[in-house]
């Protein structure tokens, strides 16, 4: 993986299809090695900074466990644990941390922040999530899809994303489709479509690789023949309450439920979600949604689908760690 050494991992379109495939192959090997007890530590002596301006469960745990497995040490800098952007500029933070650490992960707000870190740190910088892109999640998704459709190329798979596609997940899915040739369908209200410029760029690239990108409001035609149906949360605790009603009214028809799964016509269709999911009333927000909007038994996905054999969301969650490990090994190990 010498071609990746000291490279950044900021968004998928920074890579070629061959490079993306190499990362997925490395992730699969690292996963197999860990499960067989044959994993070789290739990051011994490395120090990694984890900057989290937004809290996280899966991303933090994935980076920490992956680093420990490979012999590296980590420092967690949480939302209140650093001066980045407050008392110290991003540029200066990058230059300080780059003198102390071998790699830096950033999870937070604007893409320009992680890009600035990468420009000035002098060490590999990895995007754990920004407002615009979530590339590590898509690596995990692609590995999970390969595992559940073995022997099929990506340009033989159909992935549907239902719900709000104007976010970092929608953007990174477009980039993934551009590189892999997936048949990607964003099934969403038009108000929730990604920016037209990114759609056009990714559509042109997808066609070159044997795939296509479709944006539609029509659920029946959009999900027909799908191999995978994917969704994400509609609201978050950080948003004002008045936004909740507006968002739910807009997206309610796009809930992933047994009817939508059946409309695919594929008895083997699988369900994907980047988590956390509001599929029941066992969370603070889930309880509020149920009480205020009558969303009992799930918001963006029903509990029935989430807990069904079609759901592979915990395979996805596990694969966050294996794919993140691949990114760190590829960029830090000689």
Curated annotation (Swiss-Prot):
<keyword id="KW-0055">Arginine biosynthesis</keyword>
<dbReference type="GO" id="GO:0004585">
    <property type="term" value="F:ornithine carbamoyltransferase activity"/>
</dbReference>
<keyword id="KW-0808">Transferase</keyword>
<feature type="binding site">
    <location>
        <position position="320"/>
    </location>
    <ligand>
        <name>carbamoyl phosphate</name>
    </ligand>
</feature>
<feature type="binding site">
    <location>
        <begin position="134"/>
        <end position="137"/>
    </location>
    <ligand>
        <name>carbamoyl phosphate</name>
    </ligand>
</feature>
<comment type="similarity">
    <text>Belongs to the aspartate/ornithine carbamoyltransferase superfamily. OTCase family.</text>
</comment>
<feature type="binding site">
    <location>
        <position position="83"/>
    </location>
    <ligand>
        <name>carbamoyl phosphate</name>
    </ligand>
</feature>
<dbReference type="GO" id="GO:0042450">
    <property type="term" value="P:arginine biosynthetic process via ornithine"/>
</dbReference>
<feature type="binding site">
    <location>
        <position position="168"/>
    </location>
    <ligand>
        <name>L-ornithine</name>
    </ligand>
</feature>
<dbReference type="Pfam" id="PF00185">
    <property type="entry name" value="OTCace"/>
</dbReference>
<comment type="function">
    <text>Reversibly catalyzes the transfer of the carbamoyl group from carbamoyl phosphate (CP) to the N(epsilon) atom of ornithine (ORN) to produce L-citrulline.</text>
</comment>
<feature type="binding site">
    <location>
        <position position="232"/>
    </location>
    <ligand>
        <name>L-ornithine</name>
    </ligand>
</feature>
<feature type="binding site">
    <location>
        <begin position="56"/>
        <end position="59"/>
    </location>
    <ligand>
        <name>carbamoyl phosphate</name>
    </ligand>
</feature>
<protein>
    <recommendedName>
        <fullName>Ornithine carbamoyltransferase</fullName>
        <ecNumber>2.1.3.3</ecNumber>
    </recommendedName>
</protein>
<dbReference type="InterPro" id="IPR006132">
    <property type="entry name" value="Asp/Orn_carbamoyltranf_P-bd"/>
</dbReference>
<dbReference type="InterPro" id="IPR006130">
    <property type="entry name" value="Asp/Orn_carbamoylTrfase"/>
</dbReference>
<feature type="binding site">
    <location>
        <position position="107"/>
    </location>
    <ligand>
        <name>carbamoyl phosphate</name>
    </ligand>
</feature>
<dbReference type="Pfam" id="PF02729">
    <property type="entry name" value="OTCace_N"/>
</dbReference>
<dbReference type="GO" id="GO:0019240">
    <property type="term" value="P:citrulline biosynthetic process"/>
</dbReference>
<dbReference type="InterPro" id="IPR002292">
    <property type="entry name" value="Orn/put_carbamltrans"/>
</dbReference>
<feature type="binding site">
    <location>
        <begin position="236"/>
        <end position="237"/>
    </location>
    <ligand>
        <name>L-ornithine</name>
    </ligand>
</feature>
<dbReference type="InterPro" id="IPR036901">
    <property type="entry name" value="Asp/Orn_carbamoylTrfase_sf"/>
</dbReference>
<dbReference type="GO" id="GO:0006526">
    <property type="term" value="P:L-arginine biosynthetic process"/>
</dbReference>
<feature type="binding site">
    <location>
        <begin position="274"/>
        <end position="275"/>
    </location>
    <ligand>
        <name>carbamoyl phosphate</name>
    </ligand>
</feature>
<dbReference type="GO" id="GO:0016597">
    <property type="term" value="F:amino acid binding"/>
</dbReference>
<dbReference type="InterPro" id="IPR024904">
    <property type="entry name" value="OTCase_ArgI"/>
</dbReference>
<dbReference type="InterPro" id="IPR006131">
    <property type="entry name" value="Asp_carbamoyltransf_Asp/Orn-bd"/>
</dbReference>
<keyword id="KW-0963">Cytoplasm</keyword>
<keyword id="KW-0028">Amino-acid biosynthesis</keyword>
<dbReference type="GO" id="GO:0005737">
    <property type="term" value="C:cytoplasm"/>
</dbReference>
<comment type="pathway">
    <text>Amino-acid biosynthesis; L-arginine biosynthesis; L-arginine from L-ornithine and carbamoyl phosphate: step 1/3.</text>
</comment>
């Amino acid at each position: 993986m010498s071609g990746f050494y000291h490279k950044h991992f900021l968004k998928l379109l920074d890579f070629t299809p061959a490079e993306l495939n190499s990362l997925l192959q490395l992730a699969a090997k690292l996963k197999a090695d860990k499960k067989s007890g044959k994993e070789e530590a290739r990051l011994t002596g490395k120090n990694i900074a984890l900057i989290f301006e937004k809290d996280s469960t899966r991303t933090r745990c994935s980076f920490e466990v992956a680093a420990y497995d490979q012999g590296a040490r980590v420092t967690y800098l949480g939302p209140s644990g650093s001066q980045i952007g407050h008392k110290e500029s991003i540029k200066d933070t990058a230059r300080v941390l780059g003198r102390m650490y071998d790699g830096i992960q950033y999870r937070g707000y604007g893409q320009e922040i992680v890009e600035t870190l990468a420009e000035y740190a002098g060490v590999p910088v990895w995007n754990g999530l920004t407002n615009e892109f979530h590339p590590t999640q898509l690596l995990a998704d692609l590995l999970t899809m390969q595992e559940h459709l073995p022997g099929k190329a990506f340009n033989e798979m159909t992935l549907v994303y239902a719900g709000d596609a104007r976010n970092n997940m929608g953007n990174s899915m477009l980039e993934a489709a551009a590189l892999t040739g997936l048949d990607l369908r964003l099934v969403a209200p038009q108000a929730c479509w990604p920016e037209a410029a990114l759609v056009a760029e990714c559509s042109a690239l997808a066609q070159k690789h044997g795939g296509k990108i479709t944006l539609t409001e029509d659920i029946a035609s959009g999900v027909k023949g799908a191999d995978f149906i994917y969704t994400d949360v509609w609201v978050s605790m950080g948003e004002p309450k008045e936004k909740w009603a507006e968002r739910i009214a807009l997206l309610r028809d796009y809930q992933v439920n047994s009817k939508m799964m059946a409309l695919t016509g594929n008895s083997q269709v699988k369900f994907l979600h980047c988590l956390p999911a509001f599929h029941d009333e066992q969370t603070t927000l889930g309880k509020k949604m149920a009480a205020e909007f009558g969303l009992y038994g799930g918001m963006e996905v029903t509990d029935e689908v989430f807990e069904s054999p079609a759901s592979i969301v915990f395979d996805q969650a596990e694969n966050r760690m294996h794919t993140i490990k691949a990114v760190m090994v590829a960029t830090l190990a000689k």
